[in-house]
Design a protein with these regions (language model features):
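Charge-dense, helix-prone N-terminal extensions
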Residues: 1-110
């Protein structure tokens, strides 16, 4: 797989402290599901976050954040964050924003 293993290790350190999180390979990378809903992931050197439309609009004001678009059609409420915008405690802040949105979604059972 072609995604940042260093970023993945850092994500695992954080999400492993959350309940009901499982990894799943998708989008050519890896995603983490919280209660069956994608909360975050990695594609190449980008952190993928599911923030909801309001928080995503705020995140898109950051110069190192862009719409999540791997098909030619952006996914509303999702963003791609450059790995270098995840340094230090920034990664945990990004992940907590996604968690805050996803933990209010209905649980998905597969």
């Amino acid at each position: 797989m072609a995604y940042s293993e260093a970023l993945d290790r850092r994500i695992i350190e954080i999400v492993s402290t959350w309940d009901n999180v499982v990894p799943k390979e998708m989008f050519g990378g890896v995603c983490y599901l919280l209660n069956g809903n994608i909360v975050c992931g990695i594609i190449k050197d980008y952190l993928i976050l599911r923030l909801g439309e309001e928080e995503a609009a705020l995140a898109l004001q950051h110069p190192r954040v862009k719409e999540f678009d791997i098909t030619g059609r952006p996914m509303k409420g999702w963003v791609m964050v450059e790995e270098r915008a995840c340094a230090g405690k920034k990664l945990e802040r990004w992940l907590n924003k996604a968690k805050a949105f996803v933990e209010h979604l209905p649980e998905k059972r597969h």
